[in-house]
Amino acid sequence: MGSVPDGACMSTLNEVLDQRVGEAARELYEKLDCNRVRCYACGHCCPIADGQAGVCKVRFNRCGTLYAPWGYVGGVQCDPIEKKPFFHAYCGALAYSFGMLGCDLHCSYCQNWVTSQALRDPYAIVPPVAVTPELLVREAFKQGARIMVSTYNEPLITSEWAVAIFKEAKAAGLATAFVSNGNGTPKVLEYLRPWVDLYKVDLKSFDEQHYHQLGGRLQPILETIRRLYAMGFWLEVVTLVIPGFNDSDQELTRLAEFLVSVSPNIPWHVTAFHKDYKMTDPDDTGPETLARAAQIGRKAGLHYIYAGNLPGEVGDLENTRCPNCQELLVERFGYRITDYRLTPDGRCPMCRTLIPGRWDSVFRGQITDHPYVPR
């Protein structure tokens, strides 16, 4: 079955998705007594009774075996890698993004709520489309993509499907990436490490109570960031700055100081909130707030700070500069590269400082976005 008719009820979507599953990777769960299992795909580490699902609602226990989503997408699109955002990886390249349904958090401002909250919100009805990894990789090549990205919903809870796709992608010469809330576990990161090159974490707050409101905890995300860096994933971190929620100087300072404690070379993207989904009370984030967050990050010691979602309004904060001599290295307007000056080995052309990232030996120019819907 490839789609859900308009107006389908929640139970119908559940019934469809129950048929789009496979056994979870044995590395990602353990069997307990009384046909219970414990899942390690995300930081909730849910103990799941027979016949029940985890917090994510898409990983479930059937007779003592854990099942995970398989064989479909809830959305795909081809657009610049800068949109993910990754600013220190394959500048200007196209990223072929795919996602499934479900999430282990329930953020009230989620911009992808139609896919992430599809099993919690009766208004979030998305038709799952049956596909194979081979088809997705072929379509990525047709669109001119160089990176496959698991995104839109939370990819950790659909890691098995992402790995199946990434195995095909890497065999074909493509890079791979996760765009994630970072609520991981050591087991899932070990499972992903051979197949994932780039990893973006949404560090949504630096306050435990704020994370509780979103349905999670802060510490698993912080530990995931530490592990991602130590394990050699290329890591970039994004914080959506929301007025009245996470924009205080104190919270932003603690967050930036934490990132510096992992590495001052982690790119930190501070992005502007706009009213979405259920969060319609705060004002939209202005450029002055992003500039303040960037100044806090610089004071803490971060070398690469970017402001997003307000193209042309944030001055130099869309660009990459050498932290040693301040030479302009990559100039951007939104997702578009307007100038590129890095050397083939990723160095500043003036002082030869090595800029951390995953750089192409030759800048291949900016490619515009190409939306794609699978057939």
PLM region spans:
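Auxiliary Fe-S-binding modules of radical SAM enzymes
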Residues: 2-50, 249-375
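Residue-level detector of family-conserved "landmark" positions at structurally sensitive sites
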Residues: 120, 150, 179, 237-238, ...
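Conserved AdoMet/S-adenosylmethionine-binding subsite of the radical SAM
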Residues: 130-289, 293-296
